[in-house]
């Protein structure tokens, strides 16, 4: 049982990778990336690294045109256990993004259950966490000043979102169709709130 305990502890710990040169995360991780369930990344990342991370937590194909979102989500959730890649926990807290910006659709449709975002992040592109069907909580770092529209659109299990106090503009549909959302803050510095932020959120 001691051995079993040891194995469980090892599995629960995140593998750690340091990126010295932006754009080289794939080379730093090397073979076997698709087997990883938890990783912690430090150093400096660019959009190429984010695209690679996205592939590691994005087993479903993009939503076909014309398919209803509900049907797409159902299909994605049914496939979770049958498809690799396996990444479910991603800690980027001590990494830095080039330009301090997360690109649009960075983790659209991903199967991540827990993100820790870079604590120096200033901007999050639109639809960054759309259709994240297993995510329950998203804490956005206090450093973030700008968030694109559709942030968590159809992330149907999200219960809690924490926006940074310095956010001045809340863009369209930030949390639309987050059916379980019940805990969310309106930042103290907000001066503009756009439409449909909490559309389809009966509990928010």
Positions of the model-derived regions?
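Bacterial Sec-dependent N-terminal signal peptides
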Residues: 1-15
